[in-house]
Regions:
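Hydrophobic alpha-helical membrane segments
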Residues: 1-241
């Protein structure tokens, strides 16, 4: 499964090279935008978050289409994205909630017991401690957006349940995806030189379509495992693995 997911992700990345350009523009270049005025910074952050979510929904559909014998056009992927905006926003909020819970656990485990801003050494310690926690949070939602966009699921709780079942069955792959996704959040917490931060941001943006491709491949190869099984007495249980 692991080799197949990596292979399918590379096929998507190779056949949709413009996806990397899109993610660099939306997710990499904004690191050079550092407005000092909060009146500008807050709306800009909200705008970038919204744009990032829309781009993710679009790329899920567009990259997955590259695996089809007759790949659909970008216009078809845009239409799929528009139909998934509502549940996609709810899925994004659910993911933010998972990350918030991971952050709270991290602060309890690695945060300073004293008030005031953390010294540089404590910030590094907290960032390193948060990385696996964020990675696990992302891992359990590794195919959440795929369930919404590719599976047409409109109930986010059901999409999350399906993603949990995939993570339980294929946790090493999901954890790898989650740790790579979490690296961007951790990197932003580290105190590093700006040029290094900018280079890493662009590198992660270039890798983002490949991570989406991994989640797409995992979702498409595990669709039979995502539905609970009817036991015959009216109750449901997780599918056999």
């Amino acid at each position: 499964m692991f080799a197949a997911v990596l292979r399918d992700a590379w096929r998507q990345y190779r056949r949709r090279p413009l996806a990397a350009v899109i993610t660099v523009v939306v997710g990499g270049l904004p690191v050079f935008l550092e407005p000092d005025d909060p009146v500008v910074a807050v709306p800009l952050a909200v705008l970038l978050l919204g744009a990032g979510l829309l781009v993710e929904l679009f790329l899920v559909a567009w990259l997955a289409g590259a695996l089809d014998p007759a790949p659909p056009s970008a216009a078809a992927a845009l239409a799929t994205m528009r139909g998934a905006i509502g549940p996609g926003v709810r899925a994004g909020l659910l993911r933010a909630l998972y990350l918030l819970l991971a952050l709270l656990v991290g602060l309890l485990l690695f945060g300073s017991r004293e008030g005031g801003p953390l010294p540089e050494s404590e910030q590094t310690k907290l960032a390193v401690g948060l990385w696996p926690l964020f990675g696990v949070a992302f891992a359990f939602l590794a195919v959440l957006m795929q369930r919404v966009v590719l599976g047409g699921e409109r109930k986010v709780r059901q999409a999350a349940g399906a993603s949990h079942r995939v993570a339980s069955a294929h946790f090493p792959i999901c954890l790898l995806i989650g740790l790579l996704q979490a690296s961007g959040l951790v990197m932003a917490s580290l105190v590093v030189e700006f040029w290094l931060l900018a280079a890493l941001s662009i590198l992660l943006a270039l890798a983002d379509p490949y991570l989406i491709g991994m989640s797409n491949a995992l979702y498409l190869r595990t669709r039979a495992e995502q539905e609970p099984v009817d036991t015959g007495d009216g109750s449901l249980k997780p599918p056999r693995r």
